[in-house]
Amino acid sequence: MAERINQHKNPIIGTNIVRLRKERNLKAIDVIAKLQLKGIYVTTGIFSKIEHGRNNPSVEIIIALTEIFECDFNEFFKCL
């Protein structure tokens, strides 16, 4: 099981994921498909919870999202 960053939920991470996704004109289902191509299987429900700040993404998911969004960690964690 992938390690969590911490146990405290942080809605800013989800907000940043939504912002980065929309800036790249991607739908949530597109990002989920790209994650699956990288061998990371998340359901639409889990991804929605991550975007809404109800679940923290694993380190594995964060790394994959920075690759999908072609951004660095500073951009990913902006405003934290």
Map each language-model feature to its residues:
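A detector for short, charged/polar N-terminal pre-domain segments
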Residues: 1-12
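Short basic helix-loop element that most often maps to the first helix and adjoining turn
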Residues: 15-36
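Helix-turn-helix DNA-binding elements, focusing on the entry/boundary residues of the two helices
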Residues: 17, 28, 44, 59-62
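Conserved hydrophobic/aromatic packing and binding residues within compact polymer-binding modules
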Residues: 17, 31-32, 47-50, 76
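Recognition helix of helix-turn-helix/homeodomain-like DNA-binding domains
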Residues: 36-56
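DNA major-groove recognition helix of helix-turn-helix/homeodomain DNA-binding modules
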Residues: 56-75
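Conserved short acidic donor-positioning loop in nucleotide-sugar-dependent glycosyltransferases
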Residues: 79
